[in-house]
Amino acid sequence: MKFFATIAALVVAAVAAPVAEADAEASSPMLIERAGPGGINYVQNYNGNLGQFTYNENAGTYSMYWTNGVSGDFVVGLGWSTGAARSITYSSSYTASGGSYLSVYGWINSPQAEYYIVESYGSYNPCGAGQSGVTQLGTVVSDGATYTVCTDERVNEPSITGTSTFKQYWSVRQTKRTSGTVTTGNHFAYWAKYGFGNSYNFQVMAVEAFSGTGSASVTVS
């Protein structure tokens, strides 16, 4: 197992995320009929009930909180049904202990891949030294900071097309922040040297948690 264990699963738009000892069925995402700010038209709601997830798509805002009793992994957020090399501006109040990420999150259709641009996290760094199965790919400088880049391969794991083998691409900001603009194209261009494609599935500004305690209120534009 890599990144502790596997969690996953949607038919149209999946979540396959690293978690600690957890597997579960995902809640369905939702396309929004009336787009919010920045053309936001997508709600990511994977096990959002575990984090008391609430959102206002027209305002581009959402919030959640979780405790040590969190019984699995949840990934929630707002964004776009089709990803792009766009600049995503966000602001948040995000605090977390244990396993949690504040990140741009999405999927590529072909070659199939899952990706994270991690802006802040709890105590678990997915590109940290000594992580089993991780390939370090150096660093990329973007938006005034250096990000550590790594990749991992998932073998026969749940994905946006069912069970498959795919790569995870990670950029982890070395100096955490909870607001700013993420120029996703800088990361995509760097990852492309290592096989990252441009056939985009969904893309969201997300909060994920799978252990510890925390809370977040996020605005996306």
From Swiss-Prot:
Q: Which GO terms describe its cellular component?
A: extracellular region
Q: Which residues form the GH11 domain?
A: 29-221
The main place the protein resides is secreted
Instruction: Say yes or no: keyword Aminoacyl-tRNA synthetase present.
Output: no
Q: A single GO molecular function, which one? A: endo-1,4-beta-xylanase activity
Q: What pathway or pathways are given for this protein in its record?
A: Glycan degradation; xylan degradation
Question: What catalytic reaction does the record list?
Answer: Endohydrolysis of (1->4)-beta-D-xylosidic linkages in xylans
Which GO biological process entries does UniProt record here? xylan catabolic process
What is the active site of this protein?
Answer: 114 (nucleophile), 208 (proton donor)
Enzyme nomenclature, EC number? 3.2.1.8
Q: Which domain of life is it from?
A: Eukaryota
Q: Where in the cell is it found?
A: Secreted
Sorted alphabetically, which InterPro entries does this protein's record hold?
ConA-like_dom_sf (IPR013320), GH11/12 (IPR013319), GH11_AS_1 (IPR018208), GH11_dom (IPR033123), Glyco_hydro_11 (IPR001137)
The top EC class is hydrolase
Q: Name one Pfam family in it.
A: Glyco_hydro_11
Keywords from the UniProt entry: Carbohydrate metabolism, Glycosidase, Hydrolase, Polysaccharide degradation, Secreted, Signal, Xylan degradation
Query: What does UniProt report on the pH dependence of this protein?
Result: Optimum pH is 2.0.
Hey, what's the signal peptide range on this chain? Answer: 1-22
Q: Which family does it belong to?
A: Belongs to the glycosyl hydrolase 11 (cellulase G) family.
Query: What's the protein called, per UniProt?
Result: Endo-1,4-beta-xylanase 1
Species lineage: Eukaryota, Fungi, Dikarya, Ascomycota, Pezizomycotina
Write the gene name. xynI
